[in-house]
Amino acid sequence: MKAGMFYCASQASTATANGERTVTARAIDRHNPIIKDGRRSFTAPCSSGDDYVAPYRQLSKITRVPSSSGDGKSVQVDKGRRSNSGSLMKLISYDVSLARKSFGCVVATPKTPPGSTRYLLGSDPVSLAGSTGQDTVATEESEASAPKRGSSGPVEEKKKSSGSGSDQVVVLRVSLHCHCRGCQGKVKKHLSKMQGVTSFNIDFASKKVTVTGDITPLEVLGCLSKVKNAQFWTPPPPSIPRANPET
């Protein structure tokens, strides 16, 4: 038995077939995520306007890009941001100008000309001192240096007078050998280093050493005793104490 397909050409049958097709198409659209996207839906839902909640993407669009129809909040946010940035820039510029003014006040010190009344009335104490202070300092230094120079004069004169009038002649007997040149060199070396000695003479034959200068006999004896045995040629006269005229 052969199976056959029968088609009905009536209007009722075609209506039912179209309805079934639309029903299946609606069911597919309802479950399709691409078609369900809010950006593709141009018609508002059938629910009331109070209960309608816009999708997240639409909310982001509203806040980011202000539209012409009733987006006052987004415009206010942008204006607030702009106003905040403007006030911040004004504050920064004001602080910079204030810092410049204060720096200029600190660095730039007012200078008074020498001929002004402030300069003459004592605004600058160092300038008031002027040349008078320098003159007084110079005079004080000259006065202080004058007695020093005057005092050095008598000291030098005393040295000259003592060197000329108080020279003593000391004669010693030194154990010198006639053929020993080393002994003679040692004696000459010690006498030349001795302070106050102006001249000396060595006689090998008589073993006599004569020393002249601002010295004492004991100093010469102590100096030559370091080299050779020495003694006074003639014993020095004993020092006689002077009598006090008041007694």
Swiss-Prot record:
Source organism (scientific name): Arabidopsis thaliana
Molecular function GO terms recorded: metal ion binding
Main localization (coarse): cytoplasm
Ranges of residues in domain HMA: 167-235
GO cellular component labels: cytoplasm
Amino acids binding a metal cation: C180, C183
UniProt-recorded name of the protein: Protein SODIUM POTASSIUM ROOT DEFECTIVE 3
Keyword Iron-sulfur belongs to the record: no
